[in-house]
Amino acid sequence: MRIDGALMGRGLHCEFGFEPVNLNTGNFYMDQSDATMNELNGEFSITRSYNSKGTDQHSMFGRGWSFNYDQSLSQMEDGSLLYMRGDGSYLIFDKNEDGSYTAPDGYVYDLKAVSYKDTDHDYIGWELTDADQSVWSFDKYGILRYVTDVNGFKTVLDYDDDYNLSKITTPSGKTFGVKQDKFGHIKELSLPDGGKVSYKYDEQGNLISVTDPNGTTKEYKYDDDSRMTSWKDENGNTVVKNTYDKEGRVVEQTDAEKGTATFKYGKSSTTTTDNEGNKTVYHYDDQYRTTSIEYPDGTTCEKTYNAENQLASETTAAGTKTYTYDTFGNVATETREDGKTASYTYNEQNKLTSATGYNGATVTYSYDGNGNMVTSTKPDGTAITYTYDDKHRMVSQTDGRGVTTTYSYDGPNMTGYVDGNGAAWGFTYDAMNRAVTMTDPLGNVTSNSYDANGNLTSKTAADGGVTAYTLDGVGNITASTDALGNTTTYTYDKMYNMTSGTDPKGNQISYVYDKNYQQVKATDAKGNTITYKYDSMGRVIEESNKDFGTKLYEYDKAGNLKKYTDGNGNATVSKFDSLGQVLQSKDAVGNITKYEYDALGNETKITYGDGSSHSKEYDNCGRLAKETDELGAVTTYTYDAADNLVSKSDDSGRTWTYTYDNTGNRLSETNPEGGTTTYTYDKAGNLVSSTDEEGRTDTYAYDKAGNLTTSKDALGYTVSMKYDLNGNLVSSTDENGNTSTMTYDGNGNMTSVSDAKGNITAMKYDSTDNLEQTVDALKGKTTYEYDSQGNSTKMTDALGNAYSYVYDKEGNNTSIILPTGDKVLMEYDAIGQLVKCTDAQGLVITYQYDGAGNLIHSSDNGGNSMDYTYDGAGNVLTQTDELGRTATYKYDQYGRLLKLTEADGSITSYEYDVMDRITAVTDAEGHKTTFTYDKVGNQLSMTEEEEA
C-alpha cells in the first residue's frame, strides 16, 4: 500500500513515456497548468495532475485529479501520518516513540507537530519542511494553510466556514479566487487580471471540461471506473485514447494522428512498442524501481540503489557513473567512467556551498541567514557579491572588479536596473506579471501584448514597427505579420508538428512525419525534397536528395556518430572515449586527426594528418590561458575578474592589451608598438566613436531600433542611412550627397537599387529566394538557375552568353560549359580536394596533397610539374619544378617569411617590425628597400638604398 501510494504522480525511480505513462506501474499520469505567473518565490502555478490509478481519490478537481495546493495530512490508527501530495501521490510518515516522524527512504522531508493559536484556543498542527526548505503548514485537521519558502515568502490558502478553498494569495499579494460547487469541486478560478478558468463535472464527479480565459475548452472522457479514456485539446483534437487492462494499467494509447503504442506487462517488466514498432523493455524490482532498460538497438541501461533508496549507479553503453549522498540526500559525489570525481558540499539549508569539478577546481558559495546567496567565488579567488532587500530580492550585484549593478522592483517584478556605467533600464508589467514594456537608457520603448491565456500576440519595436501573431487554440503560431504587413502562415498536424509554412509571396514549404513524429520528408517551394530515415533509437541514419544523393550515418553503442558517408560514397570514421569526446577521426583518404581533452572536456590538443599539432591550456576557470601552434609559437592570455580578455602575449615578448568599461564594452586596444585605439559607447551600448592610433576619430549614430544611421569619418565625410520598419536599408547617402534607394519584397530580398543618377538595377528571386534575374539599365538582363541545393547551374549574361555548371553529390563543381560549348572538367578526391582539371584546350593538370591538405605536387600533360614541402603551419618550405630547380623558404616561429632562396642561389631577405609589417627587403644583389608606417599601419615611405 505504501509503495502504491508513493508511485502515484512522478513516482521516484520510475520511467515515464508516451502520453505519459508510468512504465513501471502502467499509471496514466498527466500534468496540466491552468495559470502561471512570476512571483517573489519563483514561478507560481495552478497545476492539475491526473492519475488513472488514483480514481478512488475524490479531490477538488474530481476523481483521479489533484493539484499542487491540494495537499493534506491524515492521522492513522497507529499514529503515523499520511501525506497527500499535490501530484496525487501519498507518503506515510512513521511516528517514533519520542513523537517525531520519519520520512520514507529516498524522500527528503522533516515533519513535526507544532502548536498554534486559533480563536484563542491552542491547537496542534504540523509543519512539513521539504528539500528546498519550504515549510508546508497544516492545521489541526491536516488542511494546508500556508506555504513559506526559505526566504519567508508566504502563499496563503483561505477557506470558507465549510472548509472549502476560497482563495489563494501569492507572496506579492496577487489573489486567485476559487469557487466550489456543492460537491466541493472547483468550478471557477479567477485570475488577478480578471480572467477566469471554468470547470465542469459529470454525475460521477469526473472533471469533463476546462475552459480557459480565451474561451477555448479541453474535454475529458472516462470509463465506468473513472479512468480517463481520452482527452481533447482546445483545437478539438483527441490527443490520446487510453485502453486499460483489468488491473487498471494502460495497455494501448492512440494519439490524434492514429499512431498507436502498446504496453505489455510481465512479472517485473514492461515492454513498450512505439508507433513505429520499436520495442523497449523496462525491468524493475519489488519496489517498482527501474533496474534496467533494454533499448530497441540492443543496448542497455542498468541502475542500482543504495540502502537509503537513492540512485547509486547508472551504467550505459558509454560506461558507469556512480553517486554518493550526504545525510540530507544531496548528491555529494559523481564519479565518471574515467575515474574522475566531482564533489559537492551543502549547508544546513541544503544550499550548495561548494562544487569541485572533475579537474579539481572549486567554486564556493556563501549565504546570509535567510538563505540568500551573498558570494560566489571562482577557483581563482574572484568573488561576485550580492545584496538583498527585506523581501529577499537581489538589489545589487558586484562583480570581481568592484563594478555594481543595482535593481529595483514592484513586488516580484524587476522594474529597472542601473548597470555599471550608470545607464538605467526600465520595465512595466501587466496584472499577471508579464513584461509589457522595456525602456532603454536612451528612452526608446519596446512593448508586448498578450491574449487572455498569456500568449504573445504582438511586439512593438521602438521605431513603432509592429509584429503581430495569430494563434490556434493550443498556442501554435498560425500566422505572423511583420511591421510592413507581410504575412507568413503555418499549419500543424494534430500532434502540433509543423506541416507547412507559406511565405508572404505565397511560396510554401512542407513537412511529412513518420508515426513517431520524426521528420521524414521536407519539400521546398520548387518541389525539391529531402527524405530522412531513422534507426530504432530515433537517430537519422539516411538523408537523401536528388542532387546530393544519399548520406549515411552510423552510430556506436553509446550513440556517437562513428561513421559518416557522404553523397559520393566517401566515409569519415571516428572513435570516441567514454565521455563521448571524439578521439580520432579518419577521413576518406586515410588522413587521421587526433584529439585530446582535459578533465572538463576542453580540447587540449589536435594532431593533424601530417603530424603537426596545436595545443591549448586552460586556467582553473576554464578560460584559454595558453596555446602552442604548429610551429611551436606560444601565446598566453590573461583575463580580468569579469572574464574579459585583458592581454595577449607571444613568446617574443609582444603584448596586446585591452580595457573595458563596466558593462564589458571594449574601451581600448593597445598594440605592441604602444599604439592605442579607443572606443566610446552610448548608454544603450551602441558604439558611437572610435579613435585610431593617430588620433583620428570616426563617429556613429543610430535610430530608435538600433540601426546605424550616420557614419562620420575623421575628415568630416558623412554617410547616412535610412531603414524601413523591418530594418531593411532603404536609402544610403554618401559623403558627396549621392543617394541610392532600395526596395524589397515581402521576404526581405532586395528587389531594386536606384543610384543617384536614377539608374535602376532590378532583382527578381525564385520561390526559394535565390537570385533569379538582374536587370541593369546599362548592362541589360542576367539570369540565373539553381539546383535543389542552391548551387548555380546556369548563368546567362546580358549578351545571351550562357555558362552552365555541373556538380557532384557533395557540391563540388565538376564541369563548366562555356558559351562556345567548350568544357572545363574538374575531378576531386574523396574529401573534396581538386585532383584533376582539364580545360577547353585539352590542358590537363593533376594535383596531390599531404595529410594536412597542402598541395604537394602538380603536373600537366605538357611535362610541367611542381613539388612542394611545408612546415607544420602550412607555409611552403621548398618548391621544385620538373627540372629539379628548387626554391627554398625560411620562416620565423610566427610564420613570417625571412628568406627566399631561388633555384639559382639568389637570396631575398625580409625584415619585420613588431606589428608583422615588412620593414626591409634585401634583394639578391644586395639592394635594400626599407618601409615606414604610421601608427595605423599605412605605409609612409619606401626608400631604396644602394647595394650594401
Identify the residue ranges that each predicted region occupies.
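Intrinsically disordered, low-complexity segments enriched in small residues
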Residues: 1-60, 118-120
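Extended charged/polar low-complexity repeat regions
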Residues: 46, 52-948
